[in-house]
């Protein structure tokens, strides 16, 4: 990797002062270090945040809402009984990330701000990879793990953050802090589509870092389900999270978010509308089809997989027998 200056920050103020243009913030480093070793990302300075105590911890409860600071380790989420009981979509998704070793190093902020695992990007061809003759490497090449929504543009990679999915389904907010102070946005608004290979994947301003995630008071039921190649140390192919509120036995409101199908975290409006005003059964859940999907040449399997994953997510959320779906 390229030689770089190392700054071990011990406070938020020190970190913000050190994060000059050309710098990169690092907590667990499970994504950044891999990109640096492969020369995909080559910062002049790395600002280490692991010793910034102001950025780690979980507070609050399901009645008032829970705040998770960005430097909190994934293992700490799994140790939280409040999250396990009331925000099971987040707890379940976190439990599936990597291995115990990775979960003990990886941070919430790092997971949310990681970069795509598209092999063309990781091989140095950029987020919007084009060959010398102008062909799109992902559209015309091996796209088995790419998006099936928003495929008319050049950003065809699948969004990489699994934790973003339950957080969006749960209606979580993200607080960013930088030289101009703090601002709070929806978790979904952390992300944007790059317009060039040098453009950012994130809406964070220069010098800003993610400070915390805020979950609203827990209402209704929530859950997650994912499909993957193998059961351990693998990324999901498709994963979904749902948050449902009820009026009696019928769904009065629904939020369904999906991983692995678009360059942004995907809100499945079709799935949400399909179950509103109805009781969740295997039949009503299956009606939440992959409406609007436009798969590429090698990933049409994700359309069928998405239907099953959403069905099983909704069944898990309400406690139905998902294995019959």
Named regions from a protein language model:
Residues 1-325:
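C-terminal structural segment of proteins
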């Amino acid at each position: 990797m390229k030689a770089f200056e190392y700054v071990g920050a011990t406070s938020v103020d020190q970190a913000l002062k050190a994060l000059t243009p050309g710098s990169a913030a690092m907590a667990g480093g499970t994504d950044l270090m891999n990109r640096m070793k492969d020369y995909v990302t080559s910062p002049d300075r790395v600002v280490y945040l692991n010793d910034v105590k102001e950025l780690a911890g979980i507070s609050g409860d399901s009645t008032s809402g829970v705040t998770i600071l960005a430097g909190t380790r994934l293992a700490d989420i799994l140790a939280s009984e409040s999250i396990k009981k009331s925000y099971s979509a987040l707890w379940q998704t976190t439990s599936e990330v990597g291995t115990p070793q990775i979960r003990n190093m990886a941070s919430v902020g790092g997971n949310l701000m990681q970069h795509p695992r598209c092999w063309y990007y990781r091989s140095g061809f950029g987020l919007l990879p084009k060959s010398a003759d102008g062909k799109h490497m992902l559209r015309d090449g091996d796209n088995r793990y790419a998006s099936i929504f928003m495929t008319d543009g050049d950003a065809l990679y699948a969004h990489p953050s699994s934790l973003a999915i339950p957080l969006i389904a749960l209606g979580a907010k993200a607080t960013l802090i930088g030289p101009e102070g703090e601002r709070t946005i929806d978790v979904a608004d952390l992300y944007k589509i790059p317009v060039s290979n040098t453009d950012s994947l994130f809406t964070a301003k220069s010098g800003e870092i993610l400070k915390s995630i805020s979950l609203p008071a827990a209402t209704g039921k929530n859950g997650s389900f994912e499909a993957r190649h193998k059961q351990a140390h693998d990324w999901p192919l498709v994963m979904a999270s749902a948050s449902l509120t009820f009026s009696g036995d019928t769904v009065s409101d629904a939020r369904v978010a999906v991983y692995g199908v678009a360059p942004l975290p995907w809100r499945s409006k079709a799935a949400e509308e399909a179950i509103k005003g109805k009781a969740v059964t295997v039949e009503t859940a299956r009606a939440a089809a992959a409406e609007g999907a436009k798969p590429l040449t090698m990933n049409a399997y994700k359309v069928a997989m998405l239907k099953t994953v959403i069905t099983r997510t909704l069944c898990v959320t309400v406690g139905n027998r998902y294995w019959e779906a």
